[in-house]
Amino acid sequence: MDALEQARAEIDAVDTQLAALFERRMAAVLQVAEYKRAHGLPIYDAARETAVLEKAAARIQSPALRPYYKNHVQNLMDVAKQYEAVVLGQNRAAYQGVEGAFAHIALRALFPHAEAVSYPTWDEVFDAVERGDAARGVVPFENSHAGDVSAVLDLCYNHPALWVVDVYDLPISQNLLVLPGTKLDQIKSVYSHQQAIAQSETFLRQFGLPATAMANTAMAAKFVAESGDASKAAIASVETAALYGLEVLVPSINTDGDNTTRFIVLSREKPTGGNRFSLLFTVDNKPGKLGEVIQIIGASGFNMESIKSRPMPHVPFEYYFYVELVGDPTADETAALLRELDRTCRTVRLLGVYTK
């Protein structure tokens, strides 16, 4: 046996021991979950996690290995929280629309074992997560062709109790769906979500097809299927066609071949780590104040990947701002940046922490 085989054999032996220890650990996690159920305690305990990570770092003698072990322990705690959520019946994820909607597809990719719960509007998804009716919410945030989903950003601003804990980029292929046997020249009206209509505007204009906006693409497909009217068509996914018994008459009608929608994941639990973080802030309506904030961010060494502005609710002609920054949200530099922004901005809030 050469050196490589010996090393791999040692890894296999250690992995066998780790598997038994993992089962032992998860049995203890089950006891913790049952105690939390009996005493009405939340799954996430920030103070406990901080203490566990500090003890974990102290166990490792090698400074080079210490951060890797801390990441390993953090992953173990994340798995434990997921297991506790299942045990406590909190394995529910909310989305807007009906089965087959792009949000439902994104949810299934993110949480394949979760109980998917549908709500009619984005507002109700936010409310469900905030109330604790769902542990997570999956909503669209922006599209590479049609731009921001402004209403969702406004909901983030208006729900300070919620965090963005993950993002997911879903490649979007918009398709013209019809009743079986329908020809293109029979179609008189098209139904879909406003974003899908915007993403398919070149095709619609080419064939002179008027479009009507609906709550989402899957609802449009369901409407066309239930109408039984061959003059109606929907713009939606291939998965939706199969779900509602429709045919794909024209595939990939979106103008942008690289059409992608970014979804965000909402949670009541504060995220612990990642390589991106996002902020919401407001500034005094004075010359140069926004520029001052941008200069502070730049001077702190953070790359700004996105900046957006939106009108402030009930405050005419004033705006709040959203920025996404590249960096470790737990680093000392991030804490220093937030302190500096707190002194400069009228308000500032850490909205999200995630890996991208």
Question: Where are the language model's segments positioned?
Answer:
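Domain-level signature for soluble enzymes in the chorismate/prephenate branch of the shikimate pathway
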Residues: 1-356
